[in-house]
């Protein structure tokens, strides 16, 4: 087989917060690659997962949920979605959430009307909705997005309809040599996923504004293929009042967080670790250009 017979390209996923894009990324990747939470706005940076076949390589891109920016970090998140759609996408994938009002999707639909690449629509969570409602949504989407390549009713959580969708994407990709070596499944280092899985557990264990105000930095990551595998991570919050919430009475909350995050990390990496967590305050870091540069959200 030559490169002329091979197809590869980027499939950029767009949707509202909590539409199920990260769950879909895990489904197409065949594993727990992306951090997920029932709470919205879990994804802050573009994350890719590779799906390979004998004659194709699909690079799926999970982007932050489309939302109105209220602070600098959200502006960056929104910008990363726009850049991925406008500059990187060979295929665009609109993950529609039928649990949210159709009107809530209007601004994103307007954005998708201007893309130049083939567009697939996935109406997710189809197992939770009557078929009549799904058909009405499909009809309205075809009116608003007349150039849709194909629409799928799927359940990313149940992995239903995902295989058919992947086949359709693979057929639509341009002829290219593979972008990544065979067997590679992402472009991120293990440290990134360790931080993401700690933050995932923060989202799952804490309430109100606290999860949204946290950033996790992995300070130490050592391995000796034995009992001394060790990770130390620092959890940043924005206010002093949030620090005792993370820690809890006599350290009870952070102990629970450590156990659940360590389990998740060990499942992902396939080996045992000792995880240590520390909490620090970085005032208003989500709106601070200096902090966002320090944390890698701004690279210029």
Swiss-Prot record:
<feature type="region of interest" description="G4">
    <location>
        <begin position="124"/>
        <end position="127"/>
    </location>
</feature>
<dbReference type="Pfam" id="PF07650">
    <property type="entry name" value="KH_2"/>
</dbReference>
<dbReference type="GO" id="GO:0043024">
    <property type="term" value="F:ribosomal small subunit binding"/>
</dbReference>
<feature type="region of interest" description="G1">
    <location>
        <begin position="15"/>
        <end position="22"/>
    </location>
</feature>
<dbReference type="GO" id="GO:0005525">
    <property type="term" value="F:GTP binding"/>
</dbReference>
<dbReference type="InterPro" id="IPR005225">
    <property type="entry name" value="Small_GTP-bd"/>
</dbReference>
<comment type="subunit">
    <text>Monomer.</text>
</comment>
<dbReference type="GO" id="GO:0005886">
    <property type="term" value="C:plasma membrane"/>
</dbReference>
<keyword id="KW-0342">GTP-binding</keyword>
<dbReference type="InterPro" id="IPR015946">
    <property type="entry name" value="KH_dom-like_a/b"/>
</dbReference>
<keyword id="KW-0472">Membrane</keyword>
<dbReference type="GO" id="GO:0005737">
    <property type="term" value="C:cytoplasm"/>
</dbReference>
<comment type="function">
    <text>An essential GTPase that binds both GDP and GTP, with rapid nucleotide exchange. Plays a role in 16S rRNA processing and 30S ribosomal subunit biogenesis and possibly also in cell cycle regulation and energy metabolism.</text>
</comment>
<dbReference type="InterPro" id="IPR004044">
    <property type="entry name" value="KH_dom_type_2"/>
</dbReference>
<protein>
    <recommendedName>
        <fullName>GTPase Era</fullName>
    </recommendedName>
</protein>
<feature type="region of interest" description="G3">
    <location>
        <begin position="62"/>
        <end position="65"/>
    </location>
</feature>
<keyword id="KW-0547">Nucleotide-binding</keyword>
<dbReference type="GO" id="GO:0000028">
    <property type="term" value="P:ribosomal small subunit assembly"/>
</dbReference>
<keyword id="KW-0699">rRNA-binding</keyword>
<feature type="binding site">
    <location>
        <begin position="15"/>
        <end position="22"/>
    </location>
    <ligand>
        <name>GTP</name>
    </ligand>
</feature>
<feature type="domain" description="Era-type G">
    <location>
        <begin position="7"/>
        <end position="175"/>
    </location>
</feature>
<keyword id="KW-1003">Cell membrane</keyword>
<feature type="region of interest" description="G5">
    <location>
        <begin position="154"/>
        <end position="156"/>
    </location>
</feature>
<keyword id="KW-0963">Cytoplasm</keyword>
<keyword id="KW-0690">Ribosome biogenesis</keyword>
<dbReference type="InterPro" id="IPR006073">
    <property type="entry name" value="GTP-bd"/>
</dbReference>
<dbReference type="Pfam" id="PF01926">
    <property type="entry name" value="MMR_HSR1"/>
</dbReference>
<feature type="binding site">
    <location>
        <begin position="124"/>
        <end position="127"/>
    </location>
    <ligand>
        <name>GTP</name>
    </ligand>
</feature>
<comment type="similarity">
    <text>Belongs to the TRAFAC class TrmE-Era-EngA-EngB-Septin-like GTPase superfamily. Era GTPase family.</text>
</comment>
<dbReference type="InterPro" id="IPR027417">
    <property type="entry name" value="P-loop_NTPase"/>
</dbReference>
<dbReference type="GO" id="GO:0003924">
    <property type="term" value="F:GTPase activity"/>
</dbReference>
<keyword id="KW-0694">RNA-binding</keyword>
<dbReference type="GO" id="GO:0070181">
    <property type="term" value="F:small ribosomal subunit rRNA binding"/>
</dbReference>
<dbReference type="InterPro" id="IPR030388">
    <property type="entry name" value="G_ERA_dom"/>
</dbReference>
<keyword id="KW-0997">Cell inner membrane</keyword>
<dbReference type="InterPro" id="IPR005662">
    <property type="entry name" value="GTPase_Era-like"/>
</dbReference>
<feature type="region of interest" description="G2">
    <location>
        <begin position="41"/>
        <end position="45"/>
    </location>
</feature>
<dbReference type="InterPro" id="IPR009019">
    <property type="entry name" value="KH_sf_prok-type"/>
</dbReference>
<feature type="binding site">
    <location>
        <begin position="62"/>
        <end position="66"/>
    </location>
    <ligand>
        <name>GTP</name>
    </ligand>
</feature>
<feature type="domain" description="KH type-2">
    <location>
        <begin position="198"/>
        <end position="283"/>
    </location>
</feature>
